[in-house]
């Protein structure tokens, strides 16, 4: 079992009327009369489907399977798990139009259908910071000097190139060493003499268990660490000599 971190922006419940309306439509945030004075309420995009800049790929089916591991998990500082400053109390799954998705309906679908039909999905969380116990920290969060960073465990992974997803064994059969250094490199897959995929080598996380989230200081250069989903990644210049060529036929040969 390995651990993974993913950063995103914190949105305070009080920030704007538009934010209140958008978030209130998909997740439970208390009204003024229901707020507890010793708590700072916030919401954030916890994780999104697709591939982030760490070359980790989140499938919709895996995010849905992990739904019951989100709520009641701790909020810590800089991933120091003993420094608990709050907790997550609600979650919602939304699409790219910020429409709330029914989790029971999602859970009833087969993995293939989920991965095809919900490729642009996000998990929103609502949480609280114990502001009377940590007043300085709460003020800094309110001033947007911190980001929220998702924490999760995963129990194994597959390897993805374009639309082709392979088990670790299959990836090894076609020449990919069991080495973290290959992730992020460009590869093309040849099958029966034809190119069937060409893209970055990515890690598809399996059996995810969300373990909470931390708040981390905003870096000096946010664009260098903001983790975007696959459909937002920029085009990069590629040296043809650096492309890894993989023979897909070796998988079939290895399975015979």
Identify what each model region corresponds to:
Residues 1-253:
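Signature of dsDNA virion morphogenesis modules
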